[in-house]
Amino acid sequence: VSTKESTLERTVVIENMEPCIDGGRFPVKRIVGQELKVSADVSKNGHDQLSVVLKWRKIGKPDWHQTPMAQTENDRWEAACHFIENAQHEYTVEAWEDAFKSWQVEYAKKYGAGNLDLRTELDKGSILAEKAAARATLKQDKERLLNFSKQLKNADAHFGAQLAKNPELSSLMAAWPDLSLSTEFQPYLRVIVDRPQALFAAWYEFFPRSAEGKANSGSKFRDCIPRIEDAKAMGFDVIYFPPIHPIGFTARKGKNNSVTSEPGDPGVPYAVGNKFGGHKAVEPELGTLDDFDWLVGEIKTRGMEFALDFVINCSPDHPYVKEHPEWFFHRPDGTIKYAENPPKKYEDVYPLNFQNPDWRILWEELKDVLLFWVQHGVSIFRVDNPHTKPNEFWEWVILEIQKDYPDVIFLAEAFTRPELMKSLAKLGFTQSYTYFAWRSTKGEITEYLTELTQTAMKYYFRPNFFPTTPDILPTFLQTGGRPAFMIRAVLAATLSPAYGIYSGFELCENVPVPGEQEYLNSEKYQFKERDWDAPGNIKDYITKLNRIRHQNRALHEYENLRFQTVENEQIIFYSKATEDLDNIILVLVNLDPYNIQTGFAYVPLESFAINDGAPFQVEDLLTGEKFDWRGRRNFVMLDPHSRPAHIFRLRRLIGMDGEQMVFA
């Protein structure tokens, strides 16, 4: 609760504001044009009427936008607003005792009871209008209010009743309220308003050195266009590269994470730095910085964006090691420690010490690295393992970058404990990796997605679903064959507005290190030989999914996800609809990659404004087939090999054309 000034006269109480992340410590997230619904409990002793408004503005601007809030039940008030600029904003609720509304209610009660001796009440109304005229700064409004004041002064009870309900008078009084005793919720709550791509985009990740799929030699930046064209043809919006910086020579890893490398082994891109430079340089085997700039330009001319991995690792050959040895961890004998995550050892990587005595210089240098790449056309950063660096650093550096470049997007690659993942999202990361890769059963998916989309997480945690990564090959994909890849693709593409695939997913690559959830012959350690059009690929299926995503607004949101009932534990059924019901999508997916599954799906007719028993049409957007359904209960059959999923567009009956039903 907060008031402008604490006095006995100021008795309006505002509490339980929603959304409000950790008492206002962290901002809510929205995108430009996306609605923010705000509610609060607003109360006052006695029976006086209240006026309540939702206010919002860009941080740093003096003037507020505002809209009236409506009372819903008891003392709960609600309103919604939209933001038109990619910038940080703030919002609050202001409320006050509205003497004119109270007068209107009191007058109506007395007049309705047959009391015609209302001179005192009319005089009171006249005085209220006169005081509002004194507050008005628009000449026309001032004159109109004075005229109403005069009319009330001279009115009889019957004419007074008409004036008390006069919409023009009510509007004028609302425009010039007495705010001398208003209460305002403080501290103001913040909103980060991002551009639309922060919510909706399809990502395609590939290692540029493997762009041509050659086994024994690497590709260069200028060899990447066919791979980018292929991703564009499949409907992807973002091209994402792992690190492109010079790779260390000392302790370079070999194939399959061997501790010894052979001549010609390219090394791990996450071991950044050698004699050719560090985080502000490119690996010479990929080309030059000019080549990189050219490639980013080519990506943008195709209507796509470029995302770059921001990895805070240094090889033993990184220039920082000689220039700033104090930035690293040291053993008792003075030598620099390499990274370890027992039982794993990373001899080719030196982690940075964010608590070193010169930490401010380190932080500034890492900020400069980000700014360097922003100035070279990078608009999105996928941040490697942010959970192993201080939260305070991320909160500071993201704010510093977005202060001048609010369009920059940060994706947190943090597969860690739930609360730490939430913390990273709260303190500024635009998007977050998730546990999606390990959620494969109906119960697991339903529980996890309900948490993401229907709890307070929806206000600050934006998921980005990757079925696989260069580090993760889930068991479901190792064993389920091509159908498993189709199943996971449709789930990722329709459950989350932001999703992506790592190259090779479209080829259904699924050979693991025995007993592990990692790829055998991973291209983290070697050049990857591939036929990009190998038989059995699912490129056409992914192309359809991305086309469906772009054409259906309901799939651009995640808070609208609702799980529905289907009589089979191996089939999952969920819906997404726009608020105006102009776009309604029903998705049914067979979660069993081996067997045909059947069941009755129950369509929530009332949610889509369809009368029970009324006909409606569903079109399978994957095949073009149309089905006329009637009633809640409808039969489905899904073959994982040929039809693992339905993505239905539901159309309601709008009329008849002769004997033909018309759906829209």
Write out the residue ranges for each language-model feature:
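Carbohydrate-interacting/catalytic domains
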Residues: V1-P208, S217-D237, P246, I299, ...
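Short, solvent-exposed turn/loop segments enriched in Gly/Ser/Thr/Pro and often Arg
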Residues: F241-F249, D309-P319, D384-P390, E413-R417, ...
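Substrate-binding cleft/loops of secretory-pathway carbohydrate-active enzymes
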Residues: P316-E326, W394, Q402-K403, F415-I445, ...
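Active-site neighborhood of glycoside hydrolase catalytic domains
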Residues: K322, E326, H330, N353-M421
